[in-house]
Amino acid sequence: MKLIVKTFQEITIKSRPVRKRFIRQLAKNIRAVLRDLDPELKVEGEWDNLEVETAVVDARVRREMIERLTCTPGIGHFLEVHEYPLGDFDDILAKCKAHFGDQLAGKMFAVRCKRAGKHAFTSMEVERYVGSGLRRECGAAGIDLKQPEVEVRMEIRLDRLFVIHRQHPGLGGYPLGALEQVLVLMSGGFDSTVAAYQMMRRGMISHFVFFNLGGRAHELGVMEVAHYLWEKYGRSQRVLFVSVPFEEVVGEILTKVDDSYMGVTLKRMMLRAASRVAERLELDALVTGEAISQVSSQTLPNLSVIDRVTDTLVLRPLIVSHKQDIIDTARQIGTAEFARHMPEYCGVISVNPTTQAKPYRVEHEESKFDMAVLERALERATQRTVDRVIDELGQDLSVEEVAEVLPGQIVIDIRHPDAQEDEPLALEGVEVQALPFYAINSRFKELDANRQYLLYCDKGVMSRLHAHHLLNEGHTNVRVYRPA
């Protein structure tokens, strides 16, 4: 299979040195993204095209390659093509007929040809010759250049002919690694996950910082969605996940700060801590999911007061987004279900939160705060690469694993719905229920408490994590299914 990758349009208008740097980075990223699927993958090209060639014939692996490329920043679109040496017009006609002939009977069609290089003919001459030949030989109803039912597309580059089989949309943006790096304040909800996606899509390597307000389930959920975002949109790069224990900070705010300023103070403490993390990691900006006036702390006066606490640039990609648009985007990118089932810990709730915070007033309230508490939180912060968070969480968990299903036991497939659809779990004589990992914690209580449940995932890590959490919640009827 050969793919022709067309770069994001904004890359092509850059100066030659910048364009070459961006395209080299994109080629490097494509190799990194697809390396585990085909170690012999070839990626070559220049200007606005990259040619990706693989000898893999497994249809499932090819589908996975295409899916990964659609989620790789820097790609405008890409084409599945059949490559041939360039022959004469009759040869071009024969190649197009071989691929499109059975689609044209009784259909209106058009022929599109793009060329690069010097040739003794024009693109229009190719289109006319091939179009008339296909109409004559394939029983087509006619030619319609405006709204054809079938498009016969090809590209001619120097002495090569590419007959286009299918076009796939890309993510756009710039290649990860070509721009600066940022730190995303991640809560795992709709806003922060979409904000992270927007930055990654634009081409910025996005690291994550999570402020734990007092819940292991919340931390686990945020780790899972951060891992999902990295795996789907940023796997070409090394990304960090930093977790900062903020329980004592919340307690200090609750006991020392006036009710109306609790929310603003908490946000300022988070920005203080995030700035310190960003400085240590040498990151260029902070990213939050705030939108104007979505909640009381996000009015312009409040945001202005919050930002004064740091000299680090704070980016808010969703600042003028409507909530429904954010939810729709989350659904589109696959984070909506994570957000919908994310445990929430609202430790700082103001009965009458201010929407017009004053700098002098917030400084007065913060003067009561013991900053040693914030320092301790930063000292206790943990850091790991995001590709390892799931594995690390799964270590040393005491959960019973079984290799065989006993009569009456139910296997729960907790894999992502895409994996469930691609490779359904079928066990003869065994009841299998599908309940994705992001919903298992909130929906397990709906199941019959008198039945025994075995959680299943591909590697056994996610199932072990969630079984451990359910056992800690008091559910004694859960085990992990690990077939031999």
From Swiss-Prot:
Domain THUMP: 63-167
GO terms, molecular function: ATP binding; CCA tRNA nucleotidyltransferase activity; tRNA binding; tRNA-uracil-4 sulfurtransferase activity
Enzyme class: transferase
UniProt: ATP binding residues: L185, M186, K267, G289, Q298
Occurrences of domain Rhodanese (ranges): 405-483
Record flagged with keyword RNA-binding: yes
Catalytic-site annotation from UniProt: C457
Biochemical pathway: Cofactor biosynthesis; thiamine diphosphate biosynthesis
Assigned keywords, A-Z: ATP-binding, Cytoplasm, Disulfide bond, Nucleotide-binding, Redox-active center, RNA-binding, Thiamine biosynthesis, Transferase, tRNA-binding
UniProt key word tRNA-binding: yes
Disulfide bond positions: C346-C457
Alphabetized InterPro entries for the sequence: Rhodanese-like_dom, Rhodanese-like_dom_sf, Rossmann-like_a/b/a_fold, ThiI_AANH, ThiI_fer, ThiI_N, THII_Thiazole_biosynth_dom, THUMP_dom
SMART domains in UniProt: THUMP
Any one annotated GO CC term: cytosol
Documented EC number(s): 2.8.1.4
Subcellular localization(s) per the UniProt record: Cytoplasm
Catalysed transformations (reactions): [ThiI sulfur-carrier protein]-S-sulfanyl-L-cysteine + a uridine in tRNA + 2 reduced [2Fe-2S]-[ferredoxin] + ATP + H(+) = [ThiI sulfur-carrier protein]-L-cysteine + a 4-thiouridine in tRNA + 2 oxidized [2Fe-2S]-[ferredoxin] + AMP + diphosphate; [ThiS sulfur-carrier protein]-C-terminal Gly-Gly-AMP + S-sulfanyl-L-cysteinyl-[cysteine desulfurase] + AH2 = [ThiS sulfur-carrier protein]-C-terminal-Gly-aminoethanethioate + L-cysteinyl-[cysteine desulfurase] + A + AMP + 2 H(+)
Gene Ontology BP terms: thiamine biosynthetic process; thiamine diphosphate biosynthetic process; thiazole biosynthetic process; tRNA 4-thiouridine biosynthesis
Similarity comment: family membership: Belongs to the ThiI family.
Role this protein plays: Catalyzes the ATP-dependent transfer of a sulfur to tRNA to produce 4-thiouridine in position 8 of tRNAs, which functions as a near-UV photosensor. Also catalyzes the transfer of sulfur to the sulfur carrier protein ThiS, forming ThiS-thiocarboxylate. This is a step in the synthesis of thiazole, in the thiamine biosynthesis pathway. The sulfur is donated as persulfide by IscS.
PANTHER family: TRNA SULFURTRANSFERASE (PTHR43209:SF1)
Name under which the protein is recorded: tRNA sulfurtransferase
Lineage, uppermost ranks: Bacteria, Pseudomonadati, Pseudomonadota, Gammaproteobacteria, Pseudomonadales
